Amino acid sequence: MNAERLMQVLLAPVVTEKATFVAEKHQQIAFRVVADATKPEIKAAVELLFKVQVEAVQVLNRKGKVKRFGRFVGRRRNERKAYVSLKEGQEIDFAEVK
């Protein structure tokens, strides 16, 4: 795993009602990640970018919804999310990240 690949693994933090609830209750942070990212890559990327220790990583693949606009049928893209559990005493402050 080279540093260049790790910099491309995380796409964005997920900021939703569910992600905020999980972050507060279980000390987990949700990220959108590239489709071919593995758990070890996600762990290494979070540790490299945010300088924290990761305890565990859970990933899920979400299928894109089929949407209709008038008589045209389209589809939203598929998405892969990662829920990252941090070790005790660790936290990520997105306001401080540059």
Swiss-Prot record:
InterPro entries: Nucleotide-bd_a/b_plait_sf, Ribosomal_uL23-like, Ribosomal_uL23/eL15/eS24_sf. Disulfide bonds: none annotated. GO terms for cellular component: ribonucleoprotein complex; ribosome. One of its GO terms (molecular function) is rRNA binding. SUPFAM superfamilies: Ribosomal proteins S24e, L23 and L15e. GO terms for biological process: translation. Keywords: Ribonucleoprotein, Ribosomal protein, RNA-binding, rRNA-binding. One of the early assembly proteins it binds 23S rRNA. One of the proteins that surrounds the polypeptide exit tunnel on the outside of the ribosome. Forms the main docking site for trigger factor binding to the ribosome. Part of the 50S ribosomal subunit. Contacts protein L29, and trigger factor when it is bound to the ribosome. Belongs to the universal ribosomal protein uL23 family. This is Large ribosomal subunit protein uL23. It comes from Bordetella avium (strain 197N). The lineage of its organism: Bacteria, Pseudomonadati, Pseudomonadota, Betaproteobacteria, Burkholderiales.
